[in-house]
Structure formats: structure tokens, C-alpha cells
């Protein structure tokens, strides 16, 4: 019968233990070297900002292909400038400020990062009391402010056929409310396009695809400022 030598067994255990420790050390060193030499991974792409274009047929793209609408052309213009954005088309043809107020709450689900508010053209065309349009827009801006959503308010101008008093009262709505709520104002959404037969449809009211392109070109700096504000607001909310 073979007897085990305790001293030999102890030596073997020590050798095995030291060997295991040495292998672990080598693996740790090798891993550290690999980490040092490994290329740095780029940060994941930021989630695109969601901007809702909330308006009437001027926003929706009346008689245009979806790709020719204001939201679609605006998104392409912003992406060309390097902005990661998703512009949601929340335009409703025929909408007045009353219609916009009625659907604002569900349009804000989920809450967007910013909104372009373009309403009032149909109020002016129908001769709706400017006080009503003012009240509706005021309520919408109050809701957006309470939700901490950055806003670009796109102004409208009343047609002259309603008389000078109506025009003055209506046109004052947008700068007044922009100042009251501390939001950015683009004075006239149809700037450079209204009354231009080359940039409007035969109805003389709605922009063609080329008309939309002109609107986008003119409003783009203001929307870029809105994007920056939305980014800052989003970053502050995370802290």
C-alpha cells in the first residue's frame, strides 16, 4: 500500500496555486493592454428631437405630395445642416384656432421636444372675431408653457377686405402673445409667398412645392434656434 507524503502533497498544492495565480495575473495584464490599445467607440447617436408642426392646411401641405409638405421639406433642410430631428406633420386642413385648441391635448401625446404653432389663417379668411383667435392662441401657448415645450409662433396677417381696424387688431395678436408668453416669433408664415402667383396654387392662397421651399428657406434660421433651445431644455431636464 502506497503512503502519500504530506510534504510532497503540500509542495504540489503550492505549485498549483502559484501557477493559477500567475495565469490569472497574465490574463489581467493582457486584458489591460487590450483595453489600452482598443479603439474608442463612438458615443451612440443621439435620439432625434421631435418637433411638431401644428397648424392648418399651410402646414399639412394642401394639394401637395407628402414629401413636398412644409414638415417634410423642413426636416430635409434641417438634416442637411446636420440636425437630427423628426418633424411631425400635425397640420389639419381647414383648421381655425378653435379647431387647433380642441385637438392640442392629444397632439401632445407623447410630449414633443418643441412645436411650431401655425394657426389663424382660416380665422382671418372667415372674418372670425380677432378676440376669439387671440383667446384660443393664448390658451394653447399657456398649455405649451405649462408643459415646458419650446415654441416657435408663426404669425399670420389678415386680408385687407375686412377693413383696416380688423387687420390692425388681428395682426397684433401674434407679437402681443409672443411677448406675453416669452416665445419666439416668426412674424409672417407666408412671407415672400403670399400674393405671389408663381409660388401659390391657382386658388391664390396655398403655396406650391416651390412656395413651401421658399417658406422653409426663410424660416430655417428661426427653426434652428428652436432646435438649440429644445436641446438645452432636454439636457436641463436630465440634470
Cite the ranges covered by each PLM segment.
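Compositionally biased regions
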Residues: 12-14, 18, 26, 38, ...
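Short histidine/acidic/glycine/proline-rich micro-motifs that form metal-
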Residues: 58-61, 65, 91-95, 122-124, ...
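Bacterial N-terminal signal peptides
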Residues: 24-36
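Compositionally biased, disordered extreme N-termini, encompassing classical targeting presequences
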Residues: 18-21, 36-48, 233-239
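Serine-esterase "nucleophile elbow" of acetyl-processing enzymes
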Residues: 41-93, 103-111
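N-terminal secretory signal peptides that target proteins for export/translocation
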Residues: 1-20
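Alpha-helical cap/lid subdomain in secreted, periplasmic
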Residues: 8, 73-84, 99-239
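Structured catalytic cores of enzymes that bind and process phosphorylated ligands/cofactors
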Residues: 2, 40-43, 47, 151, ...
Amino acid at each position: 500500500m502506497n503512503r502519500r507524503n504530506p510534504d510532497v502533497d503540500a509542495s504540489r498544492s503550492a505549485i498549483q496555486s502559484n501557477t493559477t495565480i500567475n495565469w490569472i495575473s497574465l490574463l489581467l495584464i493582457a486584458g489591460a493592454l487590450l483595453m489600452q490599445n482598443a479603439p474608442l467607440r463612438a458615443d451612440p447617436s443621439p435620439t432625434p428631437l421631435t418637433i411638431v408642426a401644428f397648424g392648418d392646411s399651410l402646414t399639412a401641405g394642401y394639394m401637395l405630395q407628402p414629401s413636398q409638405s412644409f414638415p417634410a421639406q423642413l426636416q430635409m433642410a434641417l438634416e442637411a445642416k446636420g440636425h437630427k430631428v423628426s418633424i411631425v406633420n400635425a397640420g389639419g386642413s381647414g383648421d381655425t384656432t378653435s379647431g387647433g385648441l380642441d385637438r392640442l391635448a392629444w397632439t401632445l401625446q407623447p410630449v414633443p421636444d418643441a412645436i411650431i404653432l401655425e394657426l389663424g389663417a382660416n380665422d382671418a379668411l372667415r372674418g372670425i372675431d380677432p378676440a376669439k383667435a387671440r383667446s384660443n392662441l393664448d390658451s394653447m401657448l399657456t398649455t405649451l408653457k405649462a408643459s415646458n415645450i419650446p415654441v416657435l409662433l408663426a404669425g399670420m396677417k389678415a386680408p385687407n377686405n375686412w377693413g383696416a381696424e380688423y387687420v390692425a387688431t388681428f395682426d397684433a395678436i401674434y407679437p402681443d402673445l409672443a411677448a406675453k408668453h416669452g416665445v419666439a416669433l416668426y412674424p409672417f408664415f407666408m412671407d415672400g409667398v403670399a400674393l405671389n402667383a408663381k409660388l401659390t396654387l391657382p386658388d391664390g392662397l396655398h403655396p406650391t412645392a416651390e412656395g413651401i421651399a421658399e417658406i422653409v428657406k426663410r424660416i430655417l434660421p428661426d427653426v434652428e434656434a428652436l432646435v438649440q433651445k429644445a436641446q438645452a431644455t432636454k439636457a436641463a431636464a436630465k440634470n
